[in-house]
């Protein structure tokens, strides 16, 4: 149990967040501190953060699913999505969870990807529908939001595509994979990776080792990782591609099982790939790309959302294979890969999006196929002390 420690500052009790002690002329962080009471050691300080469910916050402007989220500066952003109609709405949440609606995306779209590089949040790719023919239109568009939420439109992706993934490594935001559907209803999947510098200059590093879509991406140490997905034959893939901070590609050990529609986030020194169609497996990659397999998710599910708050990587919501049932479960992995299950989402749903702003991890939107939701659930950590 986390204990509280206070110190007097200008006549007010202030909570102690961190304590350091000198060891061999170096400042070492105190993780736990005890005091003797009646001959028994009693804890009075812990630097370990405690994860808790904060509750629901101001809802999204539009209920929707199949959208994306990222953070820039002091804002968490949710952009695009589908709710029976295709949307361009962007919702912003400040570090104090104040909700606002900045300029919308330049085009309505869903099944897009998002990441942040430098001072810009990027939303790239996706698809929409021709209002006359009702044909799918796949988009190469990238919208960039500054730390003051001013939108601009940098160079497009090299290929128009949807169901791609994005992450950031070093000074580059990467968009990888994706697919488009031709008028004859055949699919083309892509191995393409587009890189955007902190000044939004686009380049094209080495492609993924295979064309695929429905993959997941995250970053650990000096590597951006793209894992899983469907290959060009629509079969689940286990391949993981790693990009260094200089955009050199390598292929570390594959996922322990092939899967698509999985989720990814990073915590401590680990990148986590969790779930996927019919899977409860979680694979962890260290900063040296050594793969391990921590405890499985508490339920096998796909179309989850994932984010990290404090020392916890969270996987929330999702659907069950071949069933019209959805989950409200949240699985939390600590920086030492210990799994716990905090209070779940306020209700079950899949196709949601997640990001973190300040001390809050936010899970927004989603669907259960009967409705599209505006709800945003927040998780927080209490910090040290």
Regions found by a protein language model. Name each.
Residues 2-12, 21-22, 35-385:
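Kelch-like beta-propeller repeat domains
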Residues 30-32:
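Trimeric viral appendage architectures of receptor-binding fibers, tailspike depolymerases
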């Amino acid at each position: 149990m986390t204990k509280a420690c206070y110190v007097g500052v200008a006549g007010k009790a202030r909570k102690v967040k961190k304590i350091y002690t000198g060891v061999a002329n170096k400042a070492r962080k105190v993780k736990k501190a005890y005091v003797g009471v009646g001959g028994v050691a009693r804890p009075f300080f812990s630097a370990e953060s405690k994860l808790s469910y904060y509750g629901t916050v101001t809802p999204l402007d539009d209920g929707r699913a199949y959208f994306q989220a990222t953070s820039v500066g002091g804002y968490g952003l949710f952009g695009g999505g589908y709710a029976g109609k295709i949307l361009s709405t962007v919702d912003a949440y400040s570090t104090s969870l104040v909700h606002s609606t900045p300029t919308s995306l330049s085009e309505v779209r869903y099944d897009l990807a998002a990441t942040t590089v430098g001072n810009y949040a990027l939303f790239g790719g996706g698809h929409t529908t021709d209002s006359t023919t009702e044909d799918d239109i796949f988009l190469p568009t990238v919208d960039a939001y500054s730390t003051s939420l001013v939108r601009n439109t940098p160079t497009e992706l090299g290929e128009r595509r949807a169901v791609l993934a994005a992450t950031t490594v070093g000074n580059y935001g990467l968009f990888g994979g994706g697919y488009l559907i031709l008028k004859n209803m055949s699919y083309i999947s892509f191995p393409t990776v587009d890189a955007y510098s902190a000044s939004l200059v686009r380049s094209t590093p080495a492609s993924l080792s295979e064309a695929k879509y429905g993959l997941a991406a995250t970053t650990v140490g000096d590597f951006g990782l793209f894992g899983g997905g469907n290959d060009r034959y629509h079969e689940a893939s286990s391949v993981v591609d790693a990009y260094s901070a200089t955009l050199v590609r390598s292929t570390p050990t594959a996922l322990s099982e092939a899967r698509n529609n999985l989720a990814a986030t990073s915590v401590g020194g680990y990148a986590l790939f969790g779930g996927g169609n019919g899977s409860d497996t979680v694979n962890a990659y260290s900063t040296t790309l050594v793969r391990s397999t921590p405890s499985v998710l508490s339920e096998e599910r796909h179309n989850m959302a994932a984010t990290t708050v404090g020392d916890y990587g969270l996987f929330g919501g999702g659907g069950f294979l071949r069933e019209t049932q959805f989950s409200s479960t949240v699985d939390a992995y600590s920086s030492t890969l210990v799994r716990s299950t905090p209070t779940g989402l306020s209700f079950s749903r899949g196709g949601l999006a997640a990001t973190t702003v300040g001390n809050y991890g936010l899970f927004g939107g989603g669907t259960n196929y009967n409705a599209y939701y505006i709800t945003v659930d927040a998780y927080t950590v209490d910090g040290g002390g």
